[in-house]
Amino acid sequence: MSTMTPAEIVSELDKHIIGQAKAKKAVAVALRNRWRRQQVADPLRQEITPKNILMIGPTGVGKTEIARRLAKLADAPFIKIEATKFTEVGYVGRDVDSIVRDLIEISVKQTRETEMRKVRSKATDQAEDRILDILLPQPRAVGFGGNAEHANDDNNATRQTFRKRLREGQLDDKEVELDIEQPSAGMDIMAPPGMEEMTEQIRSMFSNLGSGKKQRRKVKIKEALKLLTDEEAAKMLNDEEVKTKAVQNVEQNGIVFLDEIDKITSRNNEGSGGEVSRQGVQRDLLPLVEGTTVNTKYGMVKTDHILFIASGAFHLAKPSDLIPELQGRFPIRVELDSLSVNDFEAILVATDASLVKQYQALLATEDVQLEFADDGIRRLAEIAYSVNEKTENIGARRLYTVIEKLLEEVSFSAGNHAGERVTIDAKYVDRALGEVSQDEDLSRYVL
């Protein structure tokens, strides 16, 4: 679980997302409150439930990116899911309980990796011993007294020399034969609606059939060391303990990001006739968000303290079009702003992995030095903003289209210009994009 303060969380988000201070603050406080709650003593701790967040804003302004970056900072089980994937119980499709099942799978994987890291050092030593046993088989005891001791000393000295060479990577390309446990063959079973639990049990039963079998393989020592380290680390783990910790982690720290929630509002489906009732999906979400118990293959999981963050563009609908009960489950509402020309300019250059840095790195692999002048950056931002205003507003995603079109010729012929420098200034931008950006009909199709 993350112990970062709200200011530190916002500072980290600022490295990747421009603007949207209100949304960043709301998310940072919600994440910090998870830690604060853990410091409160029972029974009051059980009464403190997370305050779910509804992010409202046009497409391409950073809603999904905030969630994606939050996942890395949270150090907690996190799942991002589109609300449109689900159907009302009784219809063909996924039911909302599968959100929790997917989240617990993520938590088990995360917990297993955490526990394996704790024992990795010891597992690596044991893996090295197994490889050294293959390279230097133990000599059979021959003779008595001093001779046997002398042989043992020699063997230990040789073993230490080989261990040193192994750790320095000098033996990486040498091949060895190993008996490696085969992973159990996965079996995909189509689940009828409402029978996901039975399907999981059948899948688990079949997956255990092939487990424990060993296969003899010839691999390089570098790969062998990794395989054996994973095998030894897995032996040290207690599976029941991992499952218990994973369930506890989901219940106390889990975060669910529900994207496109505006697409399941009733207004969007007025007059839709035979379409599956989206209002039914909202009603199915209610108990999950409010707090219920979901049966999974790892045991019962309570959702009372899972944090839900929902987001939507709400172009054709309003938050008030959600059913009242669901509206009440998202007490914190944050509106994200549309992007200005200055925001576009900052997105191009100010973030840690900005588009400009990405394209410079890509073309540097062909020994082409790409430079962006300040006036070139400004002109790019103005064109992206202008096209958004004239056609559909897709936010920062417009920059991908604009810069890809701008660098199309450079990218295509980069191999012929090795060692050269290409400067992108306002004139270059106008020459490449001017006609397309000014012609509204053309920009609809090209940009």
From Swiss-Prot:
UniProt GO molecular function: ATP binding; ATP hydrolysis activity; peptidase activity; proteasome-activating activity
Cellular component terms (Gene Ontology): HslUV protease complex
Keyword Plastid included in the entry's annotation: no
Cross-referenced SMART domains: AAA, ClpB_D2-small
Keyword Nucleotide-binding found: yes
Coarse class of the protein's main subcellular location: cytoplasm
Residues annotated to bind ATP: I18, G60, V61, G62, K63, T64, E65, D259, E325, R397
Membership in a protein family: Belongs to the ClpX chaperone family. HslU subfamily.
Function: ATPase subunit of a proteasome-like degradation complex; this subunit has chaperone activity. The binding of ATP and its subsequent hydrolysis by HslU are essential for unfolding of protein substrates subsequently hydrolyzed by HslV. HslU recognizes the N-terminal part of its protein substrates and unfolds these before they are guided to HslV for hydrolysis.
NCBIfam families: hslU (TIGR00390), PRK05201.1 (NF003544)
Protein name according to UniProt: ATP-dependent protease ATPase subunit HslU
